[in-house]
Amino acid sequence: MPLDLQSPPLIYLITSGETTDRTTPATEEFSVVLQLVEAAVGAQIDLVQIREKNLTASVLYQLAASASRITKGTATKLLINDRSDIAAAAGADGVHLTTYSLPTAAVRHTFGADFLIGVSTHSLAEATIACYGGADFAVFGPVFETASKKEYGEPPGLTGLTSVCSALSPFPVLALGGVSLDSVAECIRAGARGVAAIRMLQPAAQLADVAAEIRRRFAEEEF
């Protein structure tokens, strides 16, 4: 099922990264990630990123393959953080690249036109490289203050988001970092095609309600 990256509000769920190098398919945290993926499919979340950086390659592959079986044939697209090789081997839809990943152009050349590529960006320069390097979309942030992104300094806010979206339009940009239900509409108004989040979209039991509320608030806005 194709994904329309130009149709807001796109919702991009990122897993919490609470697995460890001791996680196995038999441990609870492995199952928790898969439960979240199942909830995402049920809530028709557009994109899910498996962002579990502490897992061994073997266990990450098993997790990605299990998640891929859940999302296959649904409206939810599955991306794996950084590891384009594991994403392809596990049957995921694509990869989410970071500042330290392989260059976007190299991944596109290696894995082809149908491989979905998202890229984390923190400036207009980085977003521009992602755009012209062959990414399908960029995630820009942190837009707002968030404890998990302190290393990136003062957040650019909606002004920074607007600048990036305007400069690269119609290239899809999603807002990340401190995004809440109350700020989703502001991000869309600034030019973002949607939002990416960890905390706002968890736990699994609340995901359907949160997604419905995002869509309801968007529908009530005039853009």
Feature names for model-found ranges:
Residues L97-A105, V143-L168:
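Flexible, gly/pro- and Lys/Arg-enriched active-site loops
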